[in-house]
Amino acid sequence: MKYAFSTLGLPGAPLARSASLAAAHGFDGLEIRAHPEEPLHPGSAAAERAAARRTLTAAGVAVLGVAGYTRVAAAGADEPVLAELRALVRLAADLEAPFVRVFPGGAGLPAAAADAHAVRRLSAGAAFAERHGVRILLETHDSHRTGAAVAEVLDRVARPAAGALWDVLHTWLGGEPPAASRRALAPHLGYVQVKDVRSARELTPVGLGAGVLPLAEAVAAAPRDGWLCWEYEKRWHPAAAELPGGLARGRAYLERLVAAVR
């Protein structure tokens, strides 16, 4: 198993600091939040991307994925969505990252219409991603919270460069047990995103193991040769404790869960 954390937990932090923290606490990689308020995003210049690669190489830390905000199931024209997908794929390729994260975003649409949008756009985006050695991962999130909902889309796309990102919070909120999520997502899974919260109504992040999410079951269902990525949502919950103080405990907790299922 390899371990990463998301830079969502370090809002606005320089990449060098994120990479240093990852290396110091035994994390193999970073999930890079690709938003204009962060150091790296689709608008970053070639020189900035090259500098980022040097920083990461020096720290011995990989980029697991580029976390974008494209909503592939949303209403509207296709071309703006496809342009965002292409930009995210190019950024991932420049950072030597294997994955791009996207959201469904189909709230307010009939399920059939949202699925049709997602299938069409992911099919086109995957064809582009394949040429760059990148996979586009649809996260279990918002309108498609469960593994079953995401798998229904991806089964129709049926391209190797379109896959799934399993966010264990959202499948839990959707009432789907981890074993069922794993069964649904198995043909498509890119990696697993872990986190913890106090309850379904109190989503302020807490340290791994300090909340109510079924993390032991999720880790037991995760592929042994895959990645676990801790997404600590500090950006959306400023009052939450600072991530650096919990990295060592979080990494050790995940390792214990992995060891327990060997």
Enumerate the predicted regions with their spans.
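N-terminal pre-domain/capping segments
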Residues: 1-89, 93, 97, 159, ...
